[in-house]
Swiss-Prot record:
Gene3D superfamilies: 3.30.70.260, 3.40.50.1360
Keyword terms of this UniProt record: Cytoplasm, Isomerase
InterPro entries referenced in this protein's UniProt entry, alphabetically: NagB/RpiA_transferase-like, Ribose5P_isomerase_type_A
Protein species of origin: Yarrowia lipolytica (strain CLIB 122 / E 150) (Yeast)
Subcellular location: Cytoplasm
Enzyme class: isomerase
GO cellular component: cytoplasm
Taxon lineage: Eukaryota, Fungi, Dikarya, Ascomycota, Saccharomycotina
Stated name of the protein: Ribose-5-phosphate isomerase
This protein's pathway: Carbohydrate degradation; pentose phosphate pathway; D-ribose 5-phosphate from D-ribulose 5-phosphate (non-oxidative stage): step 1/1
EC numbers on record: 5.3.1.6
Major site of localization recorded for this protein: cytoplasm
GO BP, one annotated term: pentose-phosphate shunt, non-oxidative branch
Length: 243
């Protein structure tokens, strides 16, 4: 581990490296690489593996950032549209928040639709993050709201529907500084961030279904299918949650 990294980055790195060490198959054929600051270290670790473990492996990205990570690491890039449920050996991805039952909020980087496709197609979904992303209930740490990808023509209706459902706030996510208008996803859609307060672990799946059924919603940032999560701690240890 590099002592030059700030403590938070060291925490991310140890979690990512251990996750790869314990879950990257020796005979991997297709592997998903997600988005976010911790996944940088997933790509770093995979790139350091013996070439015989990666030379025949196809790596699937969840967006522009992870595509660059794969290419910069000299790994073989594939497209998710060639694969279906169970075709990926494993997928590694970050999370904005994770509860004790491995429910996650994802989509802070606006790649939630692609992230969910990759996660759904993987036989094992591994979450990597730092200690700040672990909580007793979703909405405790990540208070920006559940990211929801929405068809542009329906965003006002979806916001109104979310508030009727009980969202304390529901707002259209603005673009980055210097960009006029809202953020646009890789699919040409908008992101609405809806905050429902603390969501008890047993209520996450039901809330996801209710939001997903709203006309105009493409996908929600509620993930309920993780198999294991690794959290790098400030003291250099790693905490894990498994099913």
């Amino acid at each position: 581990m590099s002592s030059e990294l700030p403590p938070l980055e060291q925490a991310k790195r140890i979690a990512a490296h251990q996750a790869v060490e314990q879950h990257y198959p020796k005979d991997a054929k297709v592997v998903g690489i997600g988005s976010g600051s911790t996944v940088v270290y997933v790509a770093e670790k995979i790139a350091s593996l013996p070439k015989e473990l990666t030379k025949d492996t196809v790596f699937i990205s969840t967006g522009f950032q992870s595509k660059q990570l794969i290419q910069n690491a000299g790994l073989r890039l594939g497209c998710i549209d060639q694969y279906s449920n169970g075709d990926l050996d494993v997928a590694f991805d970050g999370a904005d928040e994770t509860d004790p039952q491995l429910n996650c909020i994802k989509g802070g980087g606006a790649c939630l639709f692609q992230e969910k496709i990759v996660a759904e197609c993987a036989r094992k979904f591994v979450v990597v993050a730092d200690y700040r992303k672990q909580s007793k209930a979703l909405g405790t740490v990540w208070i920006q709201g559940i990211p929801i990808e929405v068809v542009p023509d329906a965003y006002n209706k979806v916001i109104a529907d979310l508030k009727k459902m009980g969202a304390q706030s529901a707002v259209l996510r603005p673009g980055s500084p210097g960009k006029a208008g809202p953020i646009i996803t890789d699919n040409g859609n908008f992101i609405v961030d809806a905050y429902f307060g603390e969501i008890q672990p047993d209520a996450v799946k039901d809330l996801h279904i209710k939001i997903k059924l709203l006309l105009g919603v493409v996908e929600t940032g509620l993930f309920t299918n993780a198999d294991v999560a690794y959290f790098g701690n400030a003291d250099g240890t790693i905490s894990t949650i498994t099913k």
